[in-house]
Amino acid sequence: MVDNKLSQYVQKQLDNRDKTGLVNYLLYENGKIVINKKNYNDVIKKNKNVLRSNSIGKSMISYVIGHAVCEGYIDSVNVKLDDWIVLNDTLYADNTLLQVLNMTSGDEDYIGETKFNDDGLFNGERNKQVNRRTVAESMLWFKGTKKKKENSRYNYNAMSTGVAINYAIHKVGKDYEKLLKKIFADHVGIKDTFHFMKVSWSPKDVVKGSQRYSFFATSEDYLRIAKTIMNDYHSDSCIGDYLRFIYDNRIKKKLKDYPRRTNYQSAAATYEYGGQIHFSYKGMKDRVIFAMDGFAGQQMIIDMDNKRILIVNSIDQHYNWNKIVYKVIKN
């Protein structure tokens, strides 16, 4: 472990947790952990140090889908989603899996940050939150909808993610829990508990699309996941091909269209997006950096070029993102 100016500043941010919200900071580079500091509150300790990812879970969803493709459950990410009855007569049935993964579903008139100041409200209505309903229930609002155009613009929203993972679960079927174990327990080597959130834990609701994207794991297991993704990216393997494919097929966000909605103190303030992952930081557009971002300051950043990983967890985002995240990755 290092004890430098960065480490000391991070400690001050952690000590001032009630103001900064920072609870965990882990920096991995040159094949070892160089900073590993935490200041958990009683709620986190009570939950066995498991940390909620929020929208970092969207990126975990993509990783699961990549494995589902590699295991042969899904032909490719270019398949149309019109073979899942839940999506019938909605714009999502007219999309490919890659299009929903890239947030280019053509749904901006109905949901998402392009038109509405939220990622999960249908038509911007507070009583129509897609994150609280199964995909089947949410699709009742989308009946008769058509996507904007074939090559639609980036529109960040929770519905595309929900459609993507629950379509994958539909294709994997009864093997889904076995697939999760194969990915996270066997391949990644997770040591502690982990799980995705669901809107319903009833087995009968699985066919309706009940899984959400929020993911829970310990800091140490987030590092294991990030290291595995980094190693996969550099490997001659199917999942490596998938990770390189989503990077090669990333799309431009056009952030100027989001001036009031983008959190510029987060990984969301990047210029490109692909496969539920943010790419292309300002000043780092020529570097391959997988930037994963979650509400309230959650960050998992994998610098593929320099083999550096940064994991940040917080209960609210008032920490100095520019100093302990952006500048660390840029240097």
Task: Describe each PLM feature range.
Residues I35, N47-K48, E113-W201, S210-Y213:
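Catalytic-site signature segments of enzymes, centered on catalytic residues
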Residues E71-Y110, M159, V172-Y213, A217, ...:
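Active-site helix/loop module of the DD-peptidase/beta-lactamase fold
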